[in-house]
Amino acid sequence: MFPGSGRQTYQQQGYPPPQGAPQYNYGPPQGPPQGYYNGPPQGYNGPPQGPPPQNYNYGHYGPPQGQGQGYGQGGPAPQMYNNNRQSGAMNDVSTAPQRFGNTDMTYQLSNCSGRKKALLVGINYFGSSNELRGCVNDIKNMSNFLNRRFGYSYDDMVILTDDQNQRNKIPTKENIIRAMQWLVKDARPNDSLVFHYSGHGGITKDLDGDEDEGYDEVIYPVDFQQAGHIVDDDMHAIMVRPLPPGCKLTALFDSCHSGTALDLPFVYSTKGVVKEPNLWKDAGTDAFGAFMQYERGNIGGAISSIGGLLKKVTNSSSSNRQQVINIKASPADVISISGCKDDQTSADASINNNATGAMSWAFIKTMTDMPEQSYLSLLNNMRTLLKEKYSQKPQLSSSHPQDMNIRFIM
């Protein structure tokens, strides 16, 4: 069990990459109209019979380059936002421990010089009434991007997509959870881990009171009708809580209702300040003070207010100490970039005749066109790319107070 949930969670058992899941075979997509990564899919009664699609081999999809097929073509490029900085003027990452105000709680950033591992999940829901077209492509493009831009080895990637016929590579709930556990197993300081999900997302009633809107965000495995969805609280418990200080986890969610899908406490605006006091509910003046200090750009003052709040609840009753755990802060370096706000849908798009998730495309294109940029410029550039055609607004959240002007690395 994890704090406040009233639900069974998933213990860290040191699982290897997924093995022994039920066998599924997938027929080719039927060409559904352009839609949204909403959820859950209606009328999905299990995968159709037959071999996997023959045109979905990995070699068919080249890596997304600045001039590559499907990227950077078809009209003038939008103006990129660079935070008025040259690449050399960005702040570099400091790996020294940093304190949450005047408490004993600390966090530590990663310089990403250690091991690199990635878990990439893409689900098209072949044969369902809400079939998607771009999710499998997203994963193939992302794996190539991670390999060529950041040096991730294909041997250190677990790829779960529903166009495969190997039972341990199908994105069932069991396989996804076991792969999440594999991702964080034996994590060390300065390691860099990536989790990418493209598929249907949704919301379910919040059972532990940690969501302001009263709902938890969820993702839908390919077998969700039989096995159920995966809740943000569980993803946090599996992938965030076990991480040591100085270990980096970058999570990318290209799905609906994904703004806080990893349940991280700090949500940032395009101005580089905390946009929502998402960290505490009914926490009183300390939380409000922290939020106002961030709005004024006073990071030191904000951290001091945060420290006052944490110290107050830590020194109070055991039930309040439980609230500290539920804050969802972490000593590790965890960042989540999501395709839209919690109340928005995320587009399943066609970019130059290539099916893709709009958010996944925007992330890869932004980083390909401008490899050296800050977290702030990345968030703004993604929004600039998307705003011409899509209403969704990418979100960035973190497990700690984030300097939005440091260099984005993963």
From Swiss-Prot:
Region Disordered, residue ranges: 1-94
GO molecular function, one term: calcium-dependent cysteine-type endopeptidase activity
Xref: Gene3D superfamilies: 3.40.50.12660
EC number: 3.4.22.-
Composition-biased stretches (Gly residues): 65-75
Purpose: Involved in cell death (apoptosis).
Short name of any one Pfam family annotated for the protein: Peptidase_C14
Taxonomic source organism: Meyerozyma guilliermondii (strain ATCC 6260 / CBS 566 / DSM 6381 / JCM 1539 / NBRC 10279 / NRRL Y-324) (Yeast)
Gene Ontology biological process terms, A to Z: apoptotic process; protein quality control for misfolded or incompletely synthesized proteins
Stored SUPFAM superfamilies: Caspase-like
Family note: Belongs to the peptidase C14B family.
Domain of life: Eukaryota
Protease among keywords: yes
A cellular component annotation (GO) from this entry: cytosol
Record: active site: H200, C256
Keywords of this entry: Apoptosis, Hydrolase, Protease, Thiol protease, Zymogen
The name this protein goes by in its record: Metacaspase-1
InterPro entries: Caspase-like_dom_sf, Metacaspase, Pept_C14_caspase
Ranges annotated as biased composition (Polar residues): 80-94
Gene that encodes the chain: MCA1
Keyword Glycoprotein in annotation: no
PANTHER family, sorted: METACASPASE-1 (PTHR48104:SF30), METACASPASE-4 (PTHR48104)
Listed Low complexity bias regions: 21-47, 55-64
